[in-house]
Regions:
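Nucleotide and nucleotide-moiety/phosphate-recognizing core
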Residues: 2-105, 115, 119-129, 136-141, ...
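Hydrophobic alpha-helical segments within soluble ligand-binding/sensing domains
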Residues: 110-113
């Protein structure tokens, strides 16, 4: 079983923001594989289904970003899964809009959701898909930037990027992170 967690903030106020790109990707996975979000459990909204012959749980934590680790820890415990069964999908301001990067481990890199997950589960060794949301302009506050929405001219690129991230997640499940990194990084 794989637990696929898209990071974001709950509530309509944050829908479509750069920081909710993880939610956009797991919603794309839900749509592509017909896995509806039906349950509220472990501080997350979840959907259960199959991808490439593997049981999966899709999850969108309903904590705020900086508490995402609580939901991830509860999901791992509830489903008796290891961190090797985890795929985390989130926004990255160090990647250009349109880029994705797959990693098998690494630091939080300033991302509070990843920092929370590493703190709660006690390791940075888990598969992740970082989705580029662009670099913060010098005159912007970081929080304002990540909570902003994409301008119209970036929306087509982001739709394609979300689709690439969905396909990358499928590749991780089907062939492993190394193969997915070779194909998508």
């Amino acid at each position: 079983m794989k637990i696929i967690v898209g990071l974001g903030n709950p509530g309509i106020k944050y829908a479509g923001s750069r920081h909710n790109t993880g939610f956009s990707v797991v919603t794309g996975i839900s749509d592509k594989f017909d896995i509806p979000f039906k349950k509220k459990e472990c501080k997350a909204v979840t959907g259960h289904g199959m991808i490439a012959g593997e049981k999966v749980v899709l999850a969108m934590p309903q904590t705020y970003m900086n508490l995402s680790g609580e939901a991830v820890q509860e999901l791992l415990h509830f489903y008796k899964c290891e961190t090797a069964d985890l795929i985390i999908i989130y926004d990255d301001i160090d990647l250009d809009v349109g880029r994705i990067r797959i990693r098998k481990q690494g630091s939080a890199g300033g991302h509070n959701g990843i920092k929370s997950i590493i703190g709660c589960i006690g390791t940075d060794e888990f598969d992740r898909i970082k989705v580029g949301v662009g670099h913060k302009p010098a005159d912007w506050d970081l929080a304002d930037y990540v909570l902003s929405r994409f301008p119209k001219e970036e929306l087509p690129v982001m739709r394609e990027t979300v689709e690439n991230a969905v396909n990358a997640c499928e590749e991780i499940i089907r062939s492993g992170a190394d193969m997915a990194m070779n194909k998508y990084n």
